Amino acid sequence: MCMKTRINKNTLACAFWTVSMMAYMFQCYQRELATLIVPCLATFLLLESNHMKFQSYRSWMPLYCFFFFYLTISGIISYINGSSIGSMLRFYLILLAIPLAQCVREPNFHAEWIVLKILAVVKASTVLLTWIDVFIKQDYQSYRMWAKSTGAGDIYILNGIPRVQILGTSIFVTLFICEFMKERRLTFYGALMAVTALAAGNSAYVLGIFAFVVFYYGPVLLKWIKKKHWKLIFVIPISIVMVTVFGFYSLRSMKVKAEFSNAVRVEQIQVLTETNPIIGSGLGHNVSGGGVWRQYDGDTYFELQTLYIYNQIGIIGLGTFYLLTLIPYARQKKRKKLMCYITYLIYTFFNPYCFDSTHIFAVLLITNCVE
């Protein structure tokens, strides 16, 4: 009877994972699917609560309890000061769920991983087919009108290269990293994930892949240098050429985008740092006003999403969050998971791909797939 209950529970958890990931991947084509992501993901976490392994870290649970009470008090104060209860509850649940999701050690995560790989291949195919069609025709107007009208994202051409920046692509860098670390080599699936991330054309995705390659191969390169390995005769020139080409292309793209994108980020730094640096302005704090480039009244997503969290809970809250999510990885003998998570934090810092459902998916994948 116990075995039957366990099987049913695991199957049910996998079913909610499937619906949540399907909604996440394909919300760009049917916006109503977005409403299923959080409820299904929350149900999955509840069903996996018996697989949460945090008791081995003595300092973790007291720190999490402190974080829980800190967010509760911050949320109450913010609500009293007129902040939206919906926004407050949203960030309250997300900030509490991410560290818990990181503690899920599902021994049978293979099923969830296979489901995700299938969904990701389907999504990658649609992105790449769109990219190819736009590249051949050199016309993106119809696609862009669709993306803008439905809230699916944006599709355009920059320097002759299409950018298919639609919802659901921000997880592809993490999928590439997890597949590479899991298989210890570049597989066809891993390459497909990386190519799809590059097809999206977001500079953050490029940064994520580049940072991972540097973190992973940096120590290997140092060992080769110490041992005076002959492979360096071929590796160093190739690396120099690749870095030069990458740098030239990045600088060229940045010149085109800098006038608007970087100006918006600078403006957001000014807006989001106008807060109490220690405790913030309160959980769910509604940013008001704006600047030359944009109005921010009621916004909950920013290019600098990390700074928005800082705006709400200050250094104490943000610092505690980072400790909670770094401790479990830092205390492991192998630091591969820590490297992958730091890579995620780096490439999402300047973009709105953290502190949301993507962040929860990322830590679940890093914890259960990276070996």
Regions flagged by a language model, labelled:
Residues 2-253, 298-371:
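Hydrophobic transmembrane helix bundles of membrane-integrated enzymes that assemble
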Residues 252-313:
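Long extracytoplasmic/lumenal interhelical loops at the membrane interface
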